[in-house]
């Protein structure tokens, strides 16, 4: 009942999407998912996740959500998977304690097949800056699955770049060895974000042998693409990139 209800909601949302076919084609190029894409934009998906969570019609519990994800069929669309992930952290789920949210996130990461399904569920939130989420993020870094590693890296970037843990983040980033493109791009993104508030520390790390040539180049590139650096720092980054 819940599955068919959610699919019905997704179909309705897809029909209301303007320029749907163009959006589907665009999404197909960048999402790199094997699943069908309905063509629903993120704001609408987030809105739908909240509506389903609040709906008396669905009354989705943690057990229901766990079952939905564990029984994820190959014919479920991309947006269906992402919707499950978004519902994990809906504010209306006040009965979901920290351990439950982490457990559900672990299950969700078993069914994702796109970087966007990972990045879209990670938010900067003090509820996710606890020791339990820190430990979970570190656990993800050593996983064999590319998207799980990406989740760990992006989680550290979103919630743990502070004075207390910055050196620990750098130390842990050195241990990431996954060769997948999206795992390595997450590392480059991490360093570029880190450089905003910890510029000298990050530049020193990027210049060291602790960072691969590929990640280093991409990190410099992402820094130069950002508008968060002063002209002086951009010049310094460009100089490091050329050396």
Q: What kind of region is each of these model predictions?
A:
Residues 1-243:
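Alpha-helical scaffold domains
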């Amino acid at each position: 009942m819940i599955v068919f209800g959610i699919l019905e909601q997704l179909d309705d949302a897809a029909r209301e999407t303007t320029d749907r076919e163009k959006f589907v084609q665009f999404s197909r190029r960048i999402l790199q998912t094997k699943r069908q894409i309905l063509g629903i934009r993120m704001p609408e998906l987030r809105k739908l996740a909240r509506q389903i969570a609040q709906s008396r019609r669905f009354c989705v519990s943690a057990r229901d959500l766990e079952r939905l994800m564990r029984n994820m069929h190959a014919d479920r669309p991309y947006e269906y998977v992402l919707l499950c992930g978004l519902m994990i952290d809906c504010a209306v789920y006040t009965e979901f304690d920290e351990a439950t949210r982490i457990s559900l996130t672990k299950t969700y990461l078993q069914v994702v097949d796109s970087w966007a399904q990972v990045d879209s569920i990670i938010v900067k939130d003090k509820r996710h800056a606890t020791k339990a989420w820190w430990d979970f993020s570190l656990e993800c870094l050593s996983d064999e699955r590319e998207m799980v590693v990406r989740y760990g890296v992006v989680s550290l970037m979103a919630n743990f770049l502070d004075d207390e843990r910055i050196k620990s983040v750098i130390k842990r980033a050195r241990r990431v060895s996954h060769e997948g493109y999206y795992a390595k791009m997450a590392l480059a993104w991490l360093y570029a974000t880190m450089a905003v508030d910890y510029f000298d520390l990050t530049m020193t790390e990027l210049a060291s042998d602790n960072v691969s040539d590929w990640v280093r180049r991409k990190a410099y590139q992402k820094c130069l693409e950002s508008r968060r650096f002063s002209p002086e720092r951009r010049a310094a980054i460009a100089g490091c990139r050329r050396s």
